């Protein structure tokens, strides 16, 4: 009888511990405005990447009620200084963490300038369906009405939601949940700067709970062909901006510098000024992959529209803007130099 009571007591204690166990969330800090400090609380002049991960966590103690939180500082930079080397380190570290049963989700604090690019890169290279959430702020940590603390709280709340699993990499900003592929920064100052493009937001956060309205359409994370685990560098890809009477010199400079690919941010439907077009044809013949995109803020770049892509072996970016087309082209070039296969990647991802 005593043995039975002891066993029941042990089971009760074990059940209690299991019920009280919180999800384990790792926060990786990379800098940005969320870690910035301004000259005064009312100033918009500030230095990004001044506050460390521990200070960020201590500023939002409420996240400790949501999850078992731990943090690490990968870098502490303004995201205008984000680069391929940091991307590779970040992707490898997240994959390492999520491969461990002791980590349920990862939150990445990041500057907003290039957050959409980092999010898309991770969306193509993370090999787990566990939640990965990018979060930042538009106001520095000591500003009046700083948005960083609320954004970080919402990001952790999203990370622990069972509904977030399998959603790909997300950006959590201003109470909204945005798809890594479609998210875009649209304003230099507004806290509501991030938008979801024509497809809109994936969901929102309210009272510490994530609510989803739709799922991502394109393949991501575990569904992609890209593996960066053994990569030490990425192919070199540049972007050339289109405009009236555009010069071919920037494109020629990329070719002369040995770049592997160039994204043309063309006018309208990815159209290219004649001198730049001629330079692009020559570049493609030299083995430099050309991707046509558009400088327009919305709308796809049509395959074989006004430009005969099949004839010149160009790739159309479809619904990717120039900066995200660059990300996908870099990864595509780690797998193939065949323009037809690269076009398929743009259709899939």
Predicted features, each with a name:
Residues 108-130, 272-281:
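Short Gly/Thr/Asp-enriched flexible loops that form oxyanion-binding sites at enzyme active sites
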Residues 135-207:
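Internal gly/pro-rich beta-alpha loop/helix module
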Residues 269-349:
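C-terminal non-catalytic interaction/assembly regions of soluble proteins
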